[in-house]
Amino acid sequence: VNRSVKWCSHLSIGKAIADLAALSTGERKAFLDGIVEPDRHHERIGRGVSSRRLSHHRASERLIMLHVWMARRSFLRNDDYEGYRHLGMALHYLQDRSVSKGFLGFTHDAREARLAKQRVPMAAIEDGMRRYMATPDFVRRSISRTRPLKDPSKIMFQASFSSAAVAAAVLDARGAKEAGREHRRLRKRHALILFPLALGSLAVGVSLSLVWMSPFPLLISVPFTIFAVHLDMPYRRSARLAEWNGISRH
């Protein structure tokens, strides 16, 4: 499949998102440049002679989230060019996750050629830009739920919806004030109650086990520690959300 066909679907989805988000000329160029960047200049991992080219059709959730975080942090620094470029790269990898490689990859190029003939379903773009949450956890779930498909129309629909939802989540900066209030509340609970409870129960268990030369006190303390850690999960989520909104976690 020639390069223009491989880029066609990415650019079509990108242009639809750029139109709906009303990006300026400069923002649009950076975004669309980013969305074809992985095909234009293949990313590599490792260093020197041990480096290898990254297969973007097998891009990991971690790699996509790396570009998502780089985009978000760039926007928080008012570096819109880098923000839109990294967002475009993240969406490229996300869209490629929708395309099944087939047996030994032999059908992949043919599937991409058929996909290039598909029109972008604007209903999926609009739906994605409505049905989102501006949180890193939402973005991660969207990535993990994107599955390789074989039917071109289903591929285009899934790629369009997930790309629009992730783009909207990354671009939405309206929740910073509320996220800051919630994080401060949970941070106080974490510092005064849950962290001391988890650490204290574990310390008591270890101390009694050493004094009694028995593992049972430690075994008894472990469930209390796990319970305290479980109760503290909202704090950890709020800490990620605070970072997402450029708020100090401490």
Where are these regions (language model features)?
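Active-site alpha-helical segments that house and flank conserved acidic catalytic motifs
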Residues: E82-L104
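N-terminal, motif-rich segments that launch catalysis or mediate targeting to/interaction with membranes
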Residues: V1-N78, R85, F103-A176, F195-A203, ...
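Juxtamembrane/start-of-transmembrane alpha-helix segments at the extracytoplasmic/lumenal side
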Residues: E178-P196
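Structural motif marking the loop-to-transmembrane transition
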Residues: D80-G83, P215-F216
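Short, aromatic-rich membrane-interface segments at the entry and exit
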Residues: V211-I220
